[in-house]
Amino acid sequence: MAAAGQEKGYLTQTAAALDKSPSLSPQLAAPIRGRPKKCLVYPHAPKSSRLSRSVLRWLQGLDLSFFPRNINRDFSNGFLIAEIFCIYYPWELELSSFENGTSLKVKLDNWAQLEKFLARKKFKLPKELIHGTIHCKAGVPEILIEEVYTLLTHREIKSIQDDFVNFTDYSYQMRLPLVSRSTVSKSIKDNIRLSELLSNPNMLTNELKAEFLILLHMLQRKLGRKLNPEWFDVKPTVGEVTLNHLPAQASGRRYNLKVKRGRVVPVLPNIGSGGSSHREIHVKQAGQHSYYSAMKPIRNMDKKP
């Protein structure tokens, strides 16, 4: 009996051990998860970019060496533009001849090679866009990328730019509140970059740019005073006050003064003999033998009885 009890206890212990062991009970063990499959992950779109979705998808599908995070900065040296053209024309353009740098010399050298290639292929890119892209003008690199997209894919896209690009931050300043807008000196510093002064040290050109920015700032101030008269404490003129206080019927009425043809208003109406008379006076001037006559009206006042 004791041996039978020991055998039963040994069997129960082995059964419990078998139940707890994960290798011998695969149906009770948790399923082992494999490694996640690798999938193609596209980089996020650059922040505050005004490129259309079709252009962004086109850039993502080119498999560039690095995806642009800042459009103004990453396209200014022309390296990514050269890489895009190398993908479409691998036998006519070598990427090894371009340098991915940030200095002004590197930018000018890269764009000079690109301009030679574009002239050889008879591609037309406006020089204003190239100049604005080199000097990181706001909104200009997006237009240049769209032009390159149209040249290479022969597809037309609808630009999503809010307004026309004038190579200044005028539209950005107009969206700011009045307190946050820049002054004249700050506007000149923001819109004339140091790279522009180094690439074109002509003083006359830079003075003309500064004068244009000053005039643009004056127009911006005048427009701000018109749109926000309460902020600048602008008092209405007498004419504006009069128009505001006119009644509704009188202000909506238009008075057209029409003069009938053939009707003459007499300047000096004829008065009877008892009204007035004229007397001729001869005046002789010294040194002259001619006489001038003057008409002097004399009124005859009749006394009433």
UniProtKB/Swiss-Prot annotation:
Biological processes per GO annotation: regulation of cytoskeleton organization
Free-text function comment from the UniProt entry: May play a role in apoptosis regulation.
Nucleus keyword on record: yes
Name the record gives this protein: Spermatogenesis-associated protein 4
Alphabetized UniProt keyword annotations: Nucleus
A GO MF term: microtubule binding
InterPro entries the UniProt entry points to: CH_2, CH_dom, CH_dom_sf, Spermatogenesis_Ciliary_MAP
Expression (tissue specificity): Highly expressed in testis, the expression is observed precisely in seminiferous tubules.
Domain Calponin-homology (CH): 49-155
GO cellular component, as recorded: axoneme; cytosol; intracellular membrane-bounded organelle; nucleoplasm
Source taxonomy: Eukaryota, Metazoa, Chordata, Craniata, Vertebrata
Gene symbol of the encoding locus: SPATA4
Domain of life of the source: Eukaryota
Record's subcellular location: Nucleus
